Amino acid sequence: MVGMGISQIQPEHMGAPAAKYAHAVKVDGAQSMVFTSGVVPTMPDGTVPPSLEGQTRVVWANLLEILRASQMGVTNIVSITTYVVASDTLTADLATVMAVRDEVMADHRAASTLVTVPALARAEWLIEISLVAAS
């Protein structure tokens, strides 16, 4: 089988993405795919950081652990869906979430959707992320 390729789809007749993501991602020749559930900000000891930034970092650490367990890394991510609890500080909250995502993703771009929601399954959770990765 020919090696896998991940390419960004950025149609010239569309505006540029609003942040550091791709409008779409095409995966050719994938041998393995990982679809995560919504990953939440619970640390191994069961605690949840109080701040959105702390929670976002825990979620990404958990996602990276899933990728490592699947013999994959950030460059295998093809799609991200992020849910953030809406608040009075939404603009700053979204900037925080995107800054952590950009730090983790570095120069890699994936298809990405960010959705604000009134609440998640537990009151202390402020963020939940699911992703798709391919190798």
How would you describe each model-predicted region?
Residues V2-S135:
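Short, polar/acidic, helix-capping and beta-turn segments at strand->helix junctions
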